[in-house]
Amino acid sequence: MIASWSVGFDEINRWTPGLLQVSIGASISEALGIQLKWPNDLIFQQQKCGGILLESSTSEERIRIGVGLNKDAREIEGVSYAGWEDYYGDINADDMFQIIDASISSILDSSPPIENSSEILWQQKSWIKLSEILSRGVITQYDEQTVNVVGLSNTGELNAISVTSKHEIQDVGDFFIAF
């Protein structure tokens, strides 16, 4: 299942893109009972089952939120992927869309009488969801150094420490998690 939402900058101007992406992942993973791997992977039993992507369009003054979620487990080029039938059972795509839509709305919807979700609340919830994987003895490396991930910044970056220094990890390019 692939779905996308288009949201105006004015509706999300209080969010940094990094924290918004991680928060959406936390909300969806919480609703589905699965894990979140920073910054945007949805994980079930150490297998990727979906992901979240944000794309901005300054000319349209909008951000598109894309969510992809596998229905069936599969293997592609020797890599196993989970599907929602593994963790949620036999549910159709329309019902799964409703769950994901509600998860995204829980963050973004501010129409009365609903108050805006606090960024600090979602930063904390995101850290809790990310910690589910990080606390299971995974190996994390950044810039070819072993690091301990110790927090999530208010912009959605990972805070990590190595033997020699502190790091703010902004990009997955030099970051690695091994289960």
Feature locations, PLM:
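Adenosine ribonucleotide-centric catalytic and binding domains
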Residues: 1
